[in-house]
């Protein structure tokens, strides 16, 4: 839908070709290739960005919000957004906006009735030191893993659990390998829309040139 809107609003001057489900690489690969300009546009969860943009750790504070409306209001705050624009710009990116997929929840094959039930569970997390510390604090055994490996990891028993928003759990059919969902709601699943800063500036200059094709 986004690609269609861009083509329509630019009168066909810009066309986006979408590559979903890590087709163009993992989270780290996407950030590096976006910075280099090979993939000019990336739609990505904020969590993997902390390695390249340390100040994005502000999104990794667990249990900061009780409702998704509070979480959305936080990133919509004009002063906050302007500060984050500078963070991305310093890293060589242009921030176009934020979206979300609701809160992240935990799916598992063990019925979690108390905090003690987290102990020892091998849970897949993203490659983010703050996420790892959170789950270790609960007594779990967090394991960083690229998302494309999660389904087979659950299937083969490499991991016992994972955490994602409901939309991701359903669309990827992770429920086929899990018995329970625990509404931890520990973090909002923020999505950032970024382009390389160089590409953004060039696009402003050359938008009147023949149709441009983008990969995201």
Task: Give residue ranges: language-model regions.
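N-terminal secretory/targeting leader peptides
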Residues: 1-71, 79, 84-208, 212-215
């Amino acid at each position: 839908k986004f690609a269609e809107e861009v083509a329509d609003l630019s009168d066909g001057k810009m066309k986006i070709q979408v590559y979903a489900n890590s087709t163009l690489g993992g989270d780290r690969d996407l950030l590096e290739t976006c910075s280099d300009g090979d993939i000019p546009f990336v739609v990505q969860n904020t969590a993997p960005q902390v390695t390249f943009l340390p100040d994005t750790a502000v999104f990794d504070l667990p249990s900061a919000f009780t409702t998704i409306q509070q979480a959305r209001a936080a990133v919509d705050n004009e002063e906050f957004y302007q500060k984050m624009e500078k963070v991305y710009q310093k890293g060589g990116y242009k921030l176009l906006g934020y979206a979300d997929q609701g809160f992240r929840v935990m799916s598992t094959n063990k019925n979690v009735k108390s905090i003690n039930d987290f102990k020892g569970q091998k849970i897949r997390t993203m490659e983010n030191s703050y996420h790892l510390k959170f789950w270790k604090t609960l007594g779990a055994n967090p394991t960083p893993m690229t998302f494309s490996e999660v389904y087979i990891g659950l299937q083969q028993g490499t991991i016992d659990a994972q955490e994602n928003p409901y939309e991701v759990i359903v669309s990827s059919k992770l429920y086929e390998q899990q018995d329970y969902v625990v509404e931890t709601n520990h973090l909002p699943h923020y999505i950032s829309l970024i382009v390389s800063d160089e590409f953004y500036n060039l696009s402003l200059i050359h938008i009147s040139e023949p149709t441009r094709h983008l990969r995201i």
